[in-house]
Amino acid sequence: MNQTQSYMDVHTSHFSSPQPYGSHGATAGGMVPYSHYQQPPPLLPPGSAGYPSTPGSYSYPYSNGVASTTQPASNSISSQVPAQILPLPAMTSHTVTPHGYVSGAAQSQQNAVHDPTGQTCPPGAKPRVTATLWEDEGSLCYQVEAKGVCVARREDNHMINGTKLLNVAGMTRGRRDGILKSEKVRHVVKIGPMHLKGVWIPYERALDFANKEKITDLLYPLFVHNIGGLLYHPANSNRTNMVVHDSQQRRLEGSQTARTSQGPQAPALHHHHSMNGSVPSHMPQASASTPQTNGRPELNRAHTFPTPPASASSLIGIPNQGSTYDWNSQNINSTVQTSQNVPIDNGLNSTRSMPTTPATTPPGNNLQGMPPYQNQPAYDSSKSYYSAAPSSQAQYASQPLPAHSLTYGQPMMKDLGSSGRPPLGPVEQEHDEVKVDRYNQPNGQVTNGTEEENGQQQEPEYVQDNVAGSYANRNSYTYTTNPSVSSLSGDHSQLGGSPSHQNGSDRMTPRTAGTNPPPQWSQGYNTPPRAVPAGSISNIVSDTRGAPNGDSYAPGTAYASNYSGYSSVNGSSMGSTKRMRDDDDDHLSRSDGRENEYETKRRKTLTEPPVGGAFMQMQQQPVPAGGVMRRR
């Protein structure tokens, strides 16, 4: 403090008290006007060493002016911001009348640096100055009102609100903003009280604008250097002292916090003590009771914030430490293989001031009441829902058509009888328009309703689901091996009239269905509904002699002869001319929709699975409406 005080007093004594230079004679008088700008304090004459011992001797020249009250304030301010007082060197020179040569030098110095206008009170004017604390900027502001506009001036750097200043001059907004934008030194304030918003400009530029606009006398005492001295009215001196002291205190705190925040040690947040049990030893342990020495209030954040979940270190690979609350190294579902105990934070101090809510209560003594996890394998092989897919197909064995097998929201077959067969008659009427749409069947033909056609409602565009199931679970299908089928030599499959003969989808032909119902109907539907085999006349003429194990899926060569123009149909030994007439009608009705059928095949090939798609496509093409026989 003594060093800065001597620095401050030497600067003020150059133009106010020349007595310490009495031993130097005439050289001191010639040195006074230049030493203020050119000589730093270490290069002063040897007489300056005695300045700190007599600090009270420098206040006597100010006994006849108002600046005597500001001398202690300037000393206290200079300890923090000494450079901010220097722009106003002639602060008290107009009131001080010391020896002649010093006052002349100081007066010439003032004329060279500052404009004297705005310093004297105009005749008849009554100075009105108010002061307010600008909390956002941490400064005291002096305010002068003129023409209903409040113009403010900061105490710390003496900048003036240029926007309000030019508003007093009555300047238009465009011209005002253009002038203020061209200023090199300016400070734009957009947040705060209305009278403090605007563009702040330095003191000298504001005084130039006021002189140009001839509003200097209106704004008196805004430009008075010692504007703070005008606040010392006998009626409100106590309040003014409080305001100035508060402003200085805020400035001191601001500079102190700015200094301490740049220090080597950041302020500790005391959050580490909640992780005492799991933090490695190389991490600094900050005690909650250690007071801080950097001047800022202590932040006990760990007493007000909830405990971090699992202390954030139980998830990191930290060396195993014995703690009081452990999870007993249970392998949860045998899938998480932990090599060490997972510690829950146990360093919770008793100084916590939180309610014991479920979110903040540590897993403490109530942990013993928790039942341990059962050590069980991740997948139970005995459960059917974890087993392989083929065994799950057995649930379709003796059910006609389960409701959940109708995937993708296809219409459910509502008219199934007790034997699992659909009725043969007028059920097809509700689906007739669909078949006309797809196969170009004439509207006059009413076809018999077989299970193939009812299964057709489930089949379009979703064939790959059932195809994949039929390939994957081929062994679960129970195709009945009929000796009557295997003993057929060359006859047509429907000429034999055997009631036990079944086509590929476990159904009987309509001719033999009514006379002798077979016993195989109860166990025929053992699979989910799959696509219909053999979509052409080959369903009637299909040669099943070469199929192994009675499976009606014949090799591809069996279908090649049937697709070659139906020569085998007309050339085979038919039993009756009535059946040949039916086949001829069927062939004619098939020839109309032939082109559409191939288009349907091509479209559906795109939706088939890649494995076996072409071969399954031949077998899954449905029998069209007139393919089996027409009802008489």
Swiss-Prot record:
GO CC, one annotated term: nucleus
Biased composition (Polar residues): 1-20, 254-264, 275-295, 340-354, 364-376, 473-506
Composition-biased stretches (Low complexity): 377-386, 558-576
GO molecular function ontology, one term from the record: sequence-specific DNA binding
Subcellular location: Nucleus
Residues of the DNA-binding region: 162-183
Induction record: Only expressed at detectable levels in conidiating cells, but not in vegetative hyphae or yeast cells.
Observed effect of gene inactivation: Leads to conidiophores that lack both metulae and phialides and that consist of a stalk from which chains of conidia bud directly.
Pfam families: KilA-N (PF04383)
Example GO biological process: conidium formation
Region annotation Disordered: where it falls in the sequence: 1-27, 246-315, 340-386, 403-460, 473-632
InterPro entries in UniProt: EFG1/Phd1/StuA, HTH_APSES_sf, KilA/APSES_HTH, Tscrpt_reg_HTH_APSES-type
Predominant cellular place of this UniProt entry's protein: nucleus
Annotated stretches, region: Nuclear localization domain: 578-604
Function: Transcription factor that regulates asexual reproduction. Binds the StuA-response elements (StRE) with the consensus sequence 5'-(A/T)CGCG(T/A)N(A/C)-3' at the promoters of target genes. Required for accurate spatial organization of the developing conidiophore. Primarily involved in the formation of the uninucleate sterigmata, which arise by budding in this multicellular structure. Required for metula and phialide formation during conidiation but is not required for dimorphic growth.
Family under the similarity heading: Belongs to the EFG1/PHD1/stuA family.
Protein's UniProt name: Cell pattern formation-associated protein stuA
Organism: Talaromyces marneffei (Penicillium marneffei)
Gene responsible for this protein: stuA
